[in-house]
């Protein structure tokens, strides 16, 4: 049995919204890479691109040419959910659902969003990650409606941190008690020169537990242009290892960097946290 055939048991489907408030901080990149990592650990994962009319998740996964039907067509009765869920060819236990086609605007309601997620749950998926639209308008409210947990993505920049802190407050107001932080595009050399806030500083300002710290890495741009998640590249990268570490923490598995020696990849990841 291969790893992609093996499916660890999970007590219930976990629905996690990945949000940021501010656009351009790497939220969709985090969704694609965390989702791929969880699938590679053997779980059944569905990724939902909830950005109506401005989807990008399919590009990062290399699935843009396979989007024929979307969630809106499922809701309107034009196709079945199985037709809209696109199964990844690399890992069969990973699927993606686009909410709409680009340049199409629909009125996605909370009720419709809940219905779609409930239907995916019924098909045996163990993790559903929702890529939330940027901003805090109706798209945000609808995207968080079916979720039980949230991952807040930010960068160590004061504008992004302020927006992330605002979103953290909105999540708390909507009864989210399991919220974790991903600090993205961390640059250790700038932190050492006091030109960038440390990950500990970012976490302290926002006040939610830290799930992972992802270093700035040019390979993220390369992988995006190739339509392949960074964690699928043959070359090991520090950012890729950091995403894998965050995914292991998310599913409750031991993290190698937590007990890493003073040298090596995992030690480098651990140093990002401080």
UniProtKB/Swiss-Prot annotation:
Compartment(s): Plastid, Chloroplast
InterPro entries: CobQ/CobB/MinD/ParA_Nub-bd_dom, MinD, MinD_FleN, P-loop_NTPase, ParA/MinD_ATPase
CDD domains given in the database record: MinD
Domain of life from the UniProt record: Eukaryota
Binding site for ATP: 22-29
GO terms, molecular function: ATP binding; ATP hydrolysis activity
Alphabetical GO biological process terms: cell division; negative regulation of cell division
Major localization listed first in the record, in broad terms: plastid
Listed GO CC annotations: chloroplast; cytoplasmic side of plasma membrane; cytosol
Keyword annotations of the record: ATP-binding, Cell cycle, Cell division, Chloroplast, Nucleotide-binding, Plastid, Septation
Family the UniProt entry places it in: Belongs to the ParA family. MinD subfamily.
Protein task: ATPase required for the correct placement of the division site.
Protein name: Putative septum site-determining protein MinD
Organism expressing this protein natively: Nephroselmis olivacea
Gene that this sequence comes from: minD-A
């Amino acid at each position: 049995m291969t790893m992609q055939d093996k499916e660890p048991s999970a007590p219930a489907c976990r629905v996690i919204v990945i949000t940021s408030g501010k656009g351009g901080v790497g939220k969709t990149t985090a969704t694609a890479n965390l989702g791929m990592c969880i699938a590679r650990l053997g779980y059944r994962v569905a990724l939902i691109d909830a950005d109506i009319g401005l989807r990008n998740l399919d590009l990062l996964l290399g699935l843009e040419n396979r989007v024929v039907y979307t969630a809106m067509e499922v809701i309107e009765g034009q196709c079945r959910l199985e037709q809209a869920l696109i199964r990844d060819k690399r890992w069969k236990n990973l699927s993606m659902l686009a909410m709409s086609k680009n340049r199409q605007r629909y009125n996605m309601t909370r009720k419709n969003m809940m219905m779609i997620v409930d239907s995916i749950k019924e098909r045996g998926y163990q993790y559903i990650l929702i890529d939330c639209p940027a901003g805090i308008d109706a798209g945000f409210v609808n995207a968080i409606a079916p979720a039980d947990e949230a991952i807040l993505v930010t960068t160590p920049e004061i504008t992004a941190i302020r927006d992330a802190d605002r979103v953290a407050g909105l999540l708390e107001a909507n009864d989210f008690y399991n919220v974790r932080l991903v600090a993205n595009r961390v640059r250790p050399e700038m932190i050492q020169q006091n030109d960038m806030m440390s990950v500990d500083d970012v976490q302290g300002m926002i006040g939610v537990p830290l799930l992972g710290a992802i270093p700035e890495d040019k390979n993220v741009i390369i992988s995006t242009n190739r339509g392949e998640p960074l964690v699928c590249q043959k070359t090991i990268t520090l950012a890729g290892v950091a995403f894998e570490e965050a995914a292991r923490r998310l599913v409750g598995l031991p993290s190698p960097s937590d007990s890493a020696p003073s040298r090596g990849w995992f030690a480098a990841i651990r140093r990002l946290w401080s």
